[in-house]
A protein has these predicted regions:
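Structural detector of well-ordered beta-strand residues that form the stable sheet scaffold
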Residues: 67, 92, 113, 166-167, ...
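Short beta-strand-to-turn element immediately C-terminal to the catalytic PLP-Schiff-base lysine
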Residues: 192-193, 206-212, 263
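Short, conserved catalytic or interaction motifs in soluble domains
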Residues: 117, 196, 367
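N-terminal "arm"/small-domain region of PLP-dependent enzymes with the aminotransferase-like
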Residues: 1-41, 244-246, 366
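PLP-dependent aminotransferase class I/II
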Residues: 10, 47-53, 60-64, 127, ...
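Conserved active-site segment immediately N-terminal to the catalytic lysine
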Residues: 168-202, 217, 241-246
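PLP-dependent aminotransferase-like
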Residues: 81-161, 165-170, 177
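Phosphate-binding glycine-rich loop
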Residues: 43-90, 104-108, 114-116, 181
């Protein structure tokens, strides 16, 4: 039984039930302390161990490589740079996506091309991609959402047909499976995020799964501001004092302390997955007969759900948010679509009818490993009493 973070008293006495809460326990604190006491604060042996454990847990194919980096955004940016995405290029991605994806594209001088999503899954609508492809299209970024996975089979067909690489943004789907294969094995590039709110956290961190050995060597240098330092040497808590710089680089490496925390998190993946699956099913059961609300699809076998998002169908989403906040229940909105931000409003886009509708209805409820059945019962009760 996990220690409760909030009590079960009246709403006036309750602590706010947060949308997110990372599972940080004594093991993570001890691992961080041990790493600090060892004195090697940069990239070192724990980073190597973290990469190997991801490889093992996700059953990454032998032809692929894992490169740990500082954030999920860093993983996206490096993936695009490895593909030589440049000014004037276009990258197809759903407008209903995280801002990190759009900013990574812009950081390369390229432009996002916004396409619509599927109403059922909130993932990229694969049937809308081909009409957006031009001679400038150099990449497609597809992101899994919440507990839903993209149609990766059809994405691979599009990739092969047009010779356009896929970057799979799997920030939401770490440790999940698609057609019996773990996420990380579907496309040329897969990126993970281990930020403070993800199912698995390094406090901040990320990783790229690469399908070519040459990409691995380049990514290892690029994450170290372009220095061709031997990764294998640094993985022994050491470094070379002579090296060369052969390409552009960034300060995107993962530190030992973050990797040490991540290693402890990976040991708890089955606990994290099970508690999230249980919470997901409890929410769906309790909310299924409310006429003005729709719940996410229930196909969560072999998945590790990241967020729990409902749709408020009566136009009163913001009223419901205020009502729940007054009852000590925090909520979120994932996300505001990219084409509505000032910085991206002039980017090329096609019919975004589903994106427009969904973005006005979505509401993310509290969903994390510390939650217990009584917390979810309380949230369900409050939603049912909303008038």
């Amino acid at each position: 039984m996990l220690k409760k973070l909030y009590n079960s008293k009246s709403s006036k006495q309750r602590n706010m039930i947060p949308v997110f809460k990372p599972l940080i326990q004594s093991s993570e604190i001890n691992a961080a302390s041990k790493s600090l006491k060892e004195g090697w604060l940069g990239m070192g042996k724990y980073v190597k161990d973290f990469e190997k454990q991801i490889e093992k847990l996700c059953k990454i194919e032998k032809s692929k490589s894992v490169v740990a980096v500082s954030t999920g955004h860093a993983a996206l940016h490096l993936s695009l740079k490895l593909l030589k995405i440049k000014k004037g290029d276009e990258v197809i991605t759903p407008s209903f996506n995280n801002t990190a994806d759009f900013q990574a594209i812009k950081a390369c001088g390229a432009n996002p091309v916004f396409v619509d999503i599927e109403e059922k899954t909130f993932c990229i609508d694969v049937n809308k991609i081909e009409n957006s492809i031009t001679k400038k299209t150099k990449c497609i970024i597809a992101m899994d959402y919440g507990s839903s996975l993209c149609n990766h089979k059809y994405l691979k067909e599009i990739s092969c047909k047009y010779d356009i690489p896929i970057i799979h943004d799997a920030a939401h789907s770490f440790a999940s499976q698609y057609e019996k294969s773990f996420i990380g094995n579907q496309h040329q590039f897969t990126i993970f995020s281990f930020d403070p709110v993800k199912s698995i956290t390094c406090i901040d961190g990320g990783a790229i799964i690469l399908n070519k050995k040459e990409y691995e060597n380049k990514a290892q240098a690029m994450r170290l501001i372009g220095m061709n330092q031997s990764a294998q040497l640094m993985y022994t808590n050491n470094r070379a004092w002579t090296y060369d710089v052969l390409d552009i680089g960034y300060r995107y490496h993962l530190s030992n302390i973050h990797a040490a925390i991540g290693l402890e998190q990976l040991k708890k993946i089955e606990l994290i997955k099970k508690t999230r699956q249980d919470s997901f099913l409890q929410y769906n059961l309790g909310l299924k007969n409310i006429s003005w609300l729709s719940t996410p699809e229930e196909n969560i076998k072999n998945k590790c759900p990241f967020i729990y998002t409902i749709r408020v169908l009566n136009g009163r989403r913001n009223e419901l948010r205020t009502y729940l906040s007054n009852l000590a229940i925090d909520t979120g909105i994932h996300w505001q679509p990219g084409h509505k931000f000032k910085y991206f409003k002039n980017e090329r886009k096609h019919n975004l009818q589903i994106t427009e509708k969904i973005s006005e209805q979505i509401l993310t409820l509290p969903f994390h490993t510390y939650m217990e059945a009584e917390d979810i019962d309380y949230i369900i009760k409050c939603i049912k009493e909303f008038r």
